[in-house]
């Protein structure tokens, strides 16, 4: 089992497209079980309507973490994208996954 904490503070968000991810974890997650975690603190983030929390998802057999937004109004979650960041956005969180 891997337990990790992280602290990411951007100085420039760039112009990436697609889902926001933390890539290159040192160990791949278990081939049959997902992992996850939570963003415990964030700052300088554009407003997220009905934000019920920011989640982390690691698919089975993966070394990438996808940052997700939970909408408390709809009960659905969606991946964060470039529009959910400013040049000085910061995220701190915790992550757990089986190997």
Residue spans of the language-model regions?
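Surface-exposed molecular-recognition determinants
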Residues: 1-99
């Amino acid at each position: 089992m891997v337990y990790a904490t992280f602290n990411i503070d951007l100085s420039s968000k760039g112009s990436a497209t697609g889902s926001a991810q933390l890539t290159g974890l040192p160990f791949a997650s278990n081939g049959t079980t997902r992992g996850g975690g939570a963003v415990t603190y964030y700052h300088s983030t554009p407003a997220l309507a009905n934000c019920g929390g920011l989640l982390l998802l690691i698919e089975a057999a993966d070394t990438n973490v996808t940052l997700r937004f939970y909408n408390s109004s709809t009960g659905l979650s969606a991946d964060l994208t470039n529009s959910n960041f400013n040049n000085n956005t910061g995220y701190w969180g915790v992550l757990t996954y089986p190997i």
